[in-house]
UniProtKB/Swiss-Prot annotation:
Residues spanning the membrane: 49-69, 83-103, 124-146, 164-184, 192-212, 230-250
Superkingdom of the source species: Eukaryota
Pfam families to which the protein is assigned, alphabetical: MIP
Protein name: Aquaporin NIP2-1
Chain positions of motif NPA 1: 106-108
SUPFAM superfamilies: Aquaporin-like
Alphabetical list of PROSITE patterns matching this protein: MIP
UniProtKB keywords: Membrane, Repeat, Transmembrane, Transmembrane helix, Transport
Length: 295
């Protein structure tokens, strides 16, 4: 294409954009008007929501069930056993539903993914509702099957509240740092994502459990608190995980190597598991999309 013809094409393209914008009385790019309701609420959103309900239910059922039994009889389940159970259920759920919903199971994780543009904001309330629903249902099922155990794996501070807050921030930072690496970076080993995140949860909860309970998850705390009618230091387990996930995601985003890999490297590094998990995250439209249109 000659220089003159390219210039004319670009001018025509700009005129078309201007005409559309004038007709709609807005400077908003037409891309946003062309988006259908299905783009915002995809047909598979219900399946993703159900996936989050089920996975969060099982997460809370296993972790809080183990903690509840440990609290009533330390000879049946050890502190280490609780941590291993929590790490294993996270690993299993990531492999089971990671390709469907991303296996967030945690409102703070969903928030961090949305803030750093790995998840659409419009779907955040649906994920939060699913996660809290799964947690609350699991907690009341535990209340029924573990009766007369009254405290069902609630997370409460064992010392000053600020000690537990700092612990929750640090352990959740660790979990989110690892999660963002294995879930979004094509250079990370995707097939080991479940093991990496599950191990991070297990390792940090071994020592955090003795101080704060090692929640790392507002949903995991709220359900048992409601079922046990115990709300001591509840704010810690909302503020701490949110600060931890946001700081962990920001840190990995900052140090992430941004140079675009070659097609050959991409095919070698991007595992089938990671590809399916990334495809489950409907990434929001890039604000600079028009800059990449070829004319």
């Amino acid at each position: 294409m000659s220089t003159n013809s390219r210039s004319n094409s670009r001018a025509n393209f700009n005129n078309e954009i201007h005409d559309i914008g004038t007709a709609q009385n807005s400077s908003m790019p037409p891309t946003y008007y062309d988006r259908s309701l299905a783009d915002i609420f995809p047909p598979h959103l219900l399946k993703k929501v159900v996936s989050e309900v089920v996975s969060t239910f099982l997460l809370v059922f296993v972790t809080c069930g183990a903690a509840g039994i440990y609290g009533s009889d330390k000879d049946r389940i050890s502190q280490l056993g609780q941590s291993v159970a929590g790490g294993l259920i996270v690993t299993v759920m990531i492999y089971a539903v990671g390709h469907i919903s991303g296996a967030h199971m945690n409102p703070a994780v969903t928030l961090a993914f949305a803030v750093f543009r790995h998840f659409p904001w419009i779907q955040v309330p649906f994920y939060w509702a699913a996660q809290f629903t799964g947690s609350i249902c699991a907690s009341f099922v535990l209340k029924a099957v573990l009766h007369p155990i009254a405290v069902l794996g609630t997370t409460t501070p064992t010392g000053p509240h600020w000690h537990s807050l700092v612990i929750e921030i640090i352990v959740t930072f660790n979990m989110m740092f690892v999660t963002l690496a294995v879930a979004t970076d094509t250079r990370a080993v995707g097939e080991l994502a479940g093991l990496a995140v599950g191990s991070a949860v297990c390792i940090t909860s071994i020592f955090a459990g003795a101080v704060s309970g090692g929640s790392m998850n507002p949903a995991r705390t709220l359900g048992p608190a409601l079922a046990s009618n115990l709300y001591t230091g509840l704010w810690i387990y909302f503020l701490g995980p949110v600060l931890g996930t946001l700081s962990g995601a920001w840190t990995y985003t900052y140090i992430r190597f941004e140079e675009a890999p070659s097609h050959k490297d991409m095919s070698q590094k991007l595992s089938s598991f990671k590809l399916r998990r990334l495809q489950s995250q409907s990434v929001a439209v890039d604000d600079d999309e028009l800059d990449h249109i070829q004319v």
